Amino acid sequence: MSIKEWPEDERPREKLLRQGPGGLSDAELLAIFLRTGVSGLSAVDLSRHLLQQFGSLRALLGAEQRAFCAAHGLGPAKYAQLQAVLEMGKRHLAEQLQRGDPLTSPQLTRDYLQAQLRDRPREVFALLLLDNQHRVIQFVELFYGTLDSASVWPREIVQIALKHNAAAVILAHNHPSGVAEPSRADRQITDRITAALALIDIRVLDHLVIGDGITVSFAERGWL
């Protein structure tokens, strides 16, 4: 049965307009994005099939182009459309943390860093630079690959902070495994960076480790 033949209060688009997006299932949200199903499957049924095939909504949204386009009911046009939607979401968060805005919401910071780092296939170490009123100066990606004491250089972080005249920073990196629990190396690197920046009176406000929908805060753990 086509979705058009469903009772109006069960149609995903009408439900979203009436209840808001938070009241819809993953399959219903995906169905609105897909708009149409395929032969024998409504858009919702196709969405359920795709979610089962990929394992989760996150896995589907983060799939590489070849795997995404190979799935029944998808293709290059849908992949391009999805990438545009995801990028607009990132830019929406970025505009809320744009240069000159005071950093007043810890949750906004988490959401922004999740959007920037969560789905990266390798580790990325980044820096959020702030002025003395905790207004955002710039977000900078610094190091890539497995992060340890040999790959993260406090001296480079000091140079970047001085270049942008930062008064404080927030450190962030992702764990591609999805497990956000900080390692011993993460804590050691943070201590080294904090000590190096303290020599020039720049505070480390937090170090956020980004996992699969989970963010661990060093500040909340009492480690800073």
Curated annotation (Swiss-Prot):
This is UPF0758 protein AHA_0160. GO terms for molecular function: metal ion binding; metallopeptidase activity. GO terms for biological process: proteolysis. It comes from the Bacteria. The keyword Calcium does not apply. It comes from Aeromonas hydrophila subsp. hydrophila (strain ATCC 7966 / DSM 30187 / BCRC 13018 / CCUG 14551 / JCM 1027 / KCTC 2358 / NCIMB 9240 / NCTC 8049). Zn(2+) binds at H173, H175, D186. It holds the Pfam family UPF0758_N. The lineage of its organism: Bacteria, Pseudomonadati, Pseudomonadota, Gammaproteobacteria, Aeromonadales. Residues 102-224 form the MPN domain. InterPro entries: MPN, RadC_JAB, RuvA_2-like, UPF0758, UPF0758_CS, UPF0758_N. Keywords: Hydrolase, Metal-binding, Metalloprotease, Protease, Zinc. A motif (JAMM motif) lies at residues 173-186. Belongs to the UPF0758 family. The keyword Zinc applies.
